[in-house]
Amino acid sequence: MTAAPDTPSDPLDLAEPGLKWGNSFARLGPGFYTELQPTPLPSPYWVGRSQALARELGLEDHWLESAEALEVLTGNRSTAGSRPLASVYSGHQFGVWAGQLGDGRAILLGDLQTPAGPQEIQLKGAGRTPYSRMGDGRAVLRSSIREFLASEAMHGLGIPTTRALCVTGSDAPVRREDIETAAVVTRTSPSFIRFGHFEHFSYSNQHDRLKTLADYVIDGFYPACREAKQPYAALLEAASERTARLMAAWQAIGFCHGVMNTDNMSILGLTIDYGPFQFLDAFDPGHICNHSDPQGRYAYNKQPNIAYWNLFCLGQALLPLIEDQEQALAALESYKTVFPQALEARMRDKLGLVETQAGDRELIESTFKLLASNKVDYTIFWRRLCGFTPQSGHESVRDLFFDRESFNAWALQYSERVAGVDQGVRANLMLKSNPKFVLRNHLGEEAIRAAKLKDFSGVNTLLGLLQAPFDEHPGHDSFSDFPPDWASSIEISCSS
């Protein structure tokens, strides 16, 4: 069954002429969601706005600065043509079947027709839904700023991700471990469908709806799968390949997600749901960024295997449609092929290895081992390495290591490998592959502390740096420096 195309709706009165709301997800039918209005956010104010994303969506810059936009993007005002809803899904959380979950505080307004195609607009923190369970449906300022900045930072790094148009705040109190204040993040994505959506309809034996959902995803996002002999196996294979490339991007940049439950896995291979994430400071393969994960299920070095485990769950959910277990397992094999290839390609770029040679994999592995044994700052190492030449003394890189003998041995190996490479070409490749700026925990924490005092300059400064993280940004070197000692005491959990 193919989802019916959207019928024209009234023009969106707050966008450029010709842009219209639709809601293709709503056409799946009421068994997939509950329609409801957002809960108004009292006395909202702007915290941060991505004008770059607004332009991509076809919105005028001045609109995102308007009082009207503030009301719409906090859920305080409805707009013609939008059809707010919360979707239902299930999932495995920390490896255990959690049953029915769903959008407990996120409300989809609809999809906006943009120059790049439809983009769903979702308000996170917009109030209780039938899927809130014991939650209050709100998000807090702290976690909302982190998600806003991380979404745009990952996009700036070229890593597939949902986006964030803005974050708005309110003085309305919200109880977590302490009393905090409410906020709403406006998220955008071609689709917010997760592995957990498929699990929900499969494990509740709603196989007709499972097929409807799979057909919707194939026809909307994986049309080439429709031509396959077994379209649903092809969908599993395509999702596996996208997820493999995403994991390669995470590992190469030093990103820890923190809570890779199946309901936090995008069917489109996007990074989604920024909670207790972290970009690595000192390189530690076993780093655990989530204080709520004491066993380290989602540690940095376990992410690739967890992604495969989650894909296996997706394969099980799709089995009623694929009907052949061996075919499903064969579709999953693409992950095992694509991930190491994609990771090696990214690491070659980071090392400036313009052409592939035998021994590159061994050089990559020795680099990781050297960084781990010396606990070297991951981002700073790679950025400084951009200036490494076989003829130089490499002092700025060597200074990062306490085991100078091991570094010297590695530097000799690396120098021999890049000796025949054009240094200008190599440096250019490396400068585009190794960012100067990432969203370190302490930078986010400083911006959050200021924002709690109604000073949003830190949020806006960070946003500008993170949207162009490979640029030098003169005068902002402090944002690319080593983290302060107190940064190691920051604890990030699932609380948001």
Swiss-Prot record:
Which amino acid positions bind ATP, per UniProt?
102, 104-105, 124, 136-137, 187, 194, 273
Catalytic activity field: L-seryl-[protein] + ATP = 3-O-(5'-adenylyl)-L-seryl-[protein] + diphosphate; L-threonyl-[protein] + ATP = 3-O-(5'-adenylyl)-L-threonyl-[protein] + diphosphate; L-tyrosyl-[protein] + ATP = O-(5'-adenylyl)-L-tyrosyl-[protein] + diphosphate; L-histidyl-[protein] + UTP = N(tele)-(5'-uridylyl)-L-histidyl-[protein] + diphosphate
Q: What does the record give as EC number?
A: 2.7.7.-, 2.7.7.108
Where along this sequence does the record place binding of Mg(2+)? 264, 273
Q: Where is the active site?
A: 263 (proton acceptor)
Q: Is-annotated flag, keyword Metal-binding?
A: yes
Q: Please indicate if the UniProt record lists S-adenosyl-L-methionine as a keyword.
A: no
Q: Which cofactor does it need?
A: Mg(2+); Mn(2+)
What task does this protein carry out?
Nucleotidyltransferase involved in the post-translational modification of proteins. It can catalyze the addition of adenosine monophosphate (AMP) or uridine monophosphate (UMP) to a protein, resulting in modifications known as AMPylation and UMPylation.
As for family, the record states: Belongs to the SELO family.
| Name used for this protein in its record | Protein nucleotidyltransferase YdiU
